[in-house]
A protein has these predicted regions:
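PLD/PLD-like phosphodiesterase catalytic module centered on the HKD motif
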Residues: 1-102
């Protein structure tokens, strides 16, 4: 699936947006898309954390080359980092905290 999270940074000023747009060329002219900023600090932090988990992936992770090739990321000596499992753990921990509060 295509990410619909946009993060723009300028020094300490970070802006986060969510969007329905995936910017696939086949969709640009045939759809109405919406993008909106995230103002809530906690939601913004959570979205950035989620994005960073994805960047760390090195198990079955793919990179898109400048030649539009869909290549596996080489892990080398790095410890395996399974982004989907880490994402599950991330939100499971948040759920436990929320459950304790309630």
């Amino acid at each position: 699936e295509h990410s619909r999270l946009f993060i723009f940074c300028n020094n300490d000023d970070t802006e986060v947006f969510i969007s329905s747009a995936d910017f696939m060329t086949r969709n640009i002219d045939a759809r109405v898309e919406v993008t909106c900023p995230i103002y809530d600090i906690e939601i913004k932090k959570d979205l950035i954390e989620t994005f960073e988990i994805g960047w760390k992936a090195n198990v079955k992770a793919r990179l898109h080359s400048d030649k539009f090739e869909n290549l596996y990321r080489k892990r080398g000596e790095e410890k395996p980092f399974r982004a989907q499992q880490e994402m599950y753990n991330h939100y499971q921990n948040k759920l436990e905290v929320i459950t304790e509060i309630l």
